[in-house]
Amino acid sequence: MIKDYRNTMLQKLLGFNPKTMTLRTESIAGITTFLTMSYILAVNTSILSSTGMDKGAVFTATALATALSTLLLAFMAKLPLAQAPSMGINAFFAFTLVQGMGYPWQVAMAALFVEGLLFILITFFNVREIVLNSIPATLRYAISVGIGMFIAFIGLKNAGIIVSDPATFVTFGPFTPVSVLALTGILLSGLLVVKQVKGALFYSILICTLIGIPLGVTTIPEGFLPISTPHSLAPTFYQFDFSQLFTLDMAVIIFTLLFFDMFDTIRTFVALDRESTPLNSPH
């Protein structure tokens, strides 16, 4: 009787179907999903903190945004999906807007905030769906590849595997502990993914972190505690600078962010559409 009541509650709250699902399977799937995407906590923090944003605040914000958006998907849409900050738009924000164009991160955050509001509007009025349906399948895959290559290029540059060159634009960098460790991580991640190891990226990050300690790449902060209270959001919370909002340059930036965000979302839809069927059926 208790089991029936539990299944009924889970069915109402999360769309749990006791005929095709078990609590054990769903729990393991949830843990596996966490292990697979937990690298975003470290990567997003590293990318955004390179702009001068407080690292602790960014880490806390990333964790909270991921948890809240995933819970909303579970309870409101009843979809077994996890959501986290995009690994494309954060790189564009940090390396193009802030480091490339020289905008303070507060100004770039204001542009991103306005873009987010516009993105909600075009989603509400089904503009995004119209755009998605009008794009040929081949172009959808090309968008996915293009954004993926952009992220990969930034990763290779940050690791020192490639460096700038006046003649060829980029060339291979020197062998350093950082670049060797990065190459090891890439090969290890690829191997574990091919072997279909659950949590492949998580284990790759963990192993490379441990290898990096004797190499001097990984440093353990003084007074490090494995469990601690979350860092405050205050250094970055609502730190928007709207002083340059009503300028032509900012309008172009907001449009570019909107364009980038839309196609980054399309990239995600294409990937999910190939792996699951609930997105193809009305909900």
Which residues are covered by each model-predicted region?
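Histidine-centered active-site/metal-ligand motif
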Residues: 283
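Early transmembrane hairpin of solute transport permeases
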Residues: 28-175
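Entry/N-cap segments of selected transmembrane alpha helices
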Residues: 159-182, 186-193, 246-257
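Hydrophobic mid-bilayer segments of alpha-helices in multi-pass membrane transport proteins
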Residues: 87, 112-114, 143, 179-187, ...
